[in-house]
């Protein structure tokens, strides 16, 4: 599951993993250690490699320069959340406000800070990051989709919240066959 920050990758990936009865790994939860210290690259790669050694998994997060080679080599599908910037910004602003106000623990004791909410530095603020990297993320993923080295992957590009809901519904197995169906509601689909 890839896309710009705030697009809903983690929410969709967790819901998809439940629907598919697959393991779920949120790359941010591995990468961001206590105090927002990044996990050393070698250890990050080792943990991701162990996760993708499994039979069925859903992973969310970009980290293309660090682990794309490991994840995409074992993947069969890349789901790309390519939502409009206005949708992403609305979501990430509300999400960040909520998390900061509630002091929600994200990963390993880390929490969003109020001072970062107002920062224009993309290295400090996830809101600034989402705004400043939206176009570049889209261009990078367009290039990856066109790259013949990724021809073994099915790219599913979702460009609206309605498309996301339809995708998740289509991934839900039918009760009789276990095969995906477009008619069955999927757990968490209304939250997307």
Protein language model regions, located:
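Conserved nucleotide-sensing/catalytic segment adjacent to the nucleotide-binding pocket
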Residues: 23-78
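Active-site signature of alpha/beta-hydrolase-fold catalytic machinery across serine-
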Residues: 15
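Hydrophobic positions on the alpha1 helix immediately C-terminal to the Walker A/P-loop
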Residues: 12
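NTP-dependent small-molecule kinase module
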Residues: 19, 128-192
